[in-house]
């Protein structure tokens, strides 16, 4: 009887789990955001070499690292851009983590959008500070080249940690899904 009871309990648990997964898949609760490969990064209009796995690309004030297909752009007291030009300081196409180096302040400014991104998720995190100053536009904006977004081409800005300051005439973040994930 004991073995029969244990077998019955195990079968019921498996049935409940299977039913739960079935219901979750019907309501799209089991799918995560598709990763969008990083295809382009520009800093102050200059195209950045996207490094191979385990490699880095480095300039004064920033480092772009590829860690098993996850790209991390670390800002280290980067002072870039100008309020006299509408060119974005950072342009991104694909998933990118913007890492704020501990105890540093990076200041980016533009007459137009400071950070312009296409599809993919821009994650901002770290223990530093990022100041975005725009004279006439939003600090972070999207440009999807006239394309519609779908499940294969998601777009979001994810704010995890760090100090983020927006100054200027425009809004902070425009035309984006914003995810807040505090530590």
Where are the regions a protein language model picked out?
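N-terminal Sec-pathway targeting helices
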Residues: 1-10
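A composition-driven surface/loop motif
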Residues: 5, 17, 21-183
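Alpha-helical transmembrane segments
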Residues: 10-18
């Amino acid at each position: 009887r004991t073995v029969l009871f244990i077998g019955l309990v195990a079968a019921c648990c498996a049935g409940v789990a299977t039913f739960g997964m079935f219901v979750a898949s019907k309501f799209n609760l089991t799918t995560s955001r598709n990763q969008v490969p990083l295809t382009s990064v520009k800093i102050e209009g200059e195209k950045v070499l996207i490094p191979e796995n385990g490699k880095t690309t480095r300039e004064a004030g920033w480092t772009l690292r590829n860690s098993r297909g996850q790209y991390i752009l670390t800002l280290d007291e980067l002072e870039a851009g100008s309020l006299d030009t509408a060119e974005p300081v950072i342009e991104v196409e694909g998933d990118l983590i913007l890492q704020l180096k501990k105890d540093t302040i990076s200041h980016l400014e533009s007459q137009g959008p400071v950070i312009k991104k296409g599809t993919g998720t821009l994650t901002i995190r770290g223990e530093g500070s990022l100041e975005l100053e725009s004279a006439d536009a939003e600090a972070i904006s999207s440009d999807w080249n006239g394309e519609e977004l779908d499940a294969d081409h998601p777009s979001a800005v994810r704010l995890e940690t760090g100090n983020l300051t927006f100054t200027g005439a425009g809004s902070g973040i425009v035309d984006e899904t914003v995810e807040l994930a505090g530590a």
